[in-house]
């Protein structure tokens, strides 16, 4: 590849052209995610509403983030997503920041690894960089791009890549092992594949030990970490998801397909839509078989270097071991999971970990060419020119697949538009709810909480306000345990969603306690909504908004807002009362003041209607 370039341009220009070309996949991913991102809660990601609602209602417990889900304890994923949701009112668009950081952070690790193994001042580096870039940003893993929940996989990949970078390039430095162990813990408590990284590192270091039969000190360190992490992870975990498991042949077919999908998909992109799972496994199975054969051949060549703990050899063994463990473990659970069977190995999301088998060989071959381990006479198939030609063929095929893959991102874009339209006001089920989540009760709970808390697709919506007319200010009434204040009003429109009123603090800094409010439709036994306001946090004459469940047909209906407090008048929050005017509504009713029965006072109340 560089040989052809050098006949037209100088080697230096060719070098930088290839480096620039390596940035194209990264830019492609940026545009692809921006165009195709699902920007509303979808499928398993909707379960985050339970933690968000608990946080808003004051019922959140940190221990709940530890709960298992699909053979994982996604503590890191839940923590990051919850904190982001709290900060942004669950604006799903903001979650892609963390997805970008994970993917580009992983690329930074792989670039640094290429610099350590190959160096920058040679023609092999840009070829290696281009190959790695095409694999990492590959649209074959599109499922990990257009859905923010796949931050779980992307973050795990980053933590694993960082761990491998540290321990394989500096295998004798304890500080690197400590940082890598922390990173592996984070990976394990994001997705189960983090445990496979523990095992891959242990095996690699034990194979590279001076005496194979004697435990290596670094391997022992990682074994201890694995055991402690497992002791924290496994209790209470339901590991069985299916009563049937694959046969040896099915497991082999799945694993080969899983390992070959990253390469096979780049040679010829197989997906036609975002949810399609190709049924044919032939191409990926062949690619997986070829990669295993080449890995075995390279491993034999690398074994003497592994005993010396050469970084390239350790990368080859560690990457391959991790990919194989991921393939077999996933196949054990998924090869007979549903009607797709072993074709589940073609799943787009799995390629993120299956690609390590290919990446390890790319790095090892690159290091071998730079350091001249193979003479062209003895290893003609691995001669520099042959490798560059193969890399050029791979790059051309991959760029074609990148172009063909845009249809998947376009499909995701259209799906997101349709999905967003499903989030209409109200709780009446619509046929499109099945796209949000397969369980109707889960969709109903999700929409109810989102509308009540005004989160996600129901956040920052436009509201129509109607303010009750009042006269001049008369006096405050104390919201203490001594009285209840009731105000009736008639809704002027459909879609009642908010009530706004003002409080005063006649007791100043002494204000404490809680104000309890409840809204009911007159004549109904069940309240529409209720809540608490911390009196100590209220500001003098500041507007307080009470959020309600969306009321579809509210126009013309009469509602009653009841307010009460705790404690004594001397520490209570105040509610300003006004003289009525001709167009004022019904007067307030004070439980301890008979004069109010004669219409002496009204409260200022603003009703807001969602549209």
Tell where the protein language model's regions lie, with residue ranges:
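Beta-sheet-rich sandwich/jelly-roll-like modules and their strand-loop junctions
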Residues: 462-523, 531-558, 562-611
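Intrinsically disordered, polar/acidic, low-complexity terminal segments
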Residues: 5-71, 85-128, 174, 203-205, ...
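Membrane-interface transmembrane helices that cradle and orient dolichyl/undecaprenyl
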Residues: 160-177
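Short hydrophobic/aromatic helix or loop-helix immediately within or flanking a transmembrane segment
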Residues: 64-89, 253-265
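Membrane-interface alpha helices of multi-pass inner-membrane proteins
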Residues: 176-203
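Hydrophobic alpha-helical membrane-interfacial segments at the cytosolic entry of transmembrane helices
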Residues: 213-234, 317, 389-390
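Aromatic- and kink-enriched transmembrane "portal" helix at the membrane-lumen/periplasm boundary
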Residues: 125-159
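Transmembrane alpha-helix segments characteristic
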Residues: 25, 127-135, 222-230, 307-336
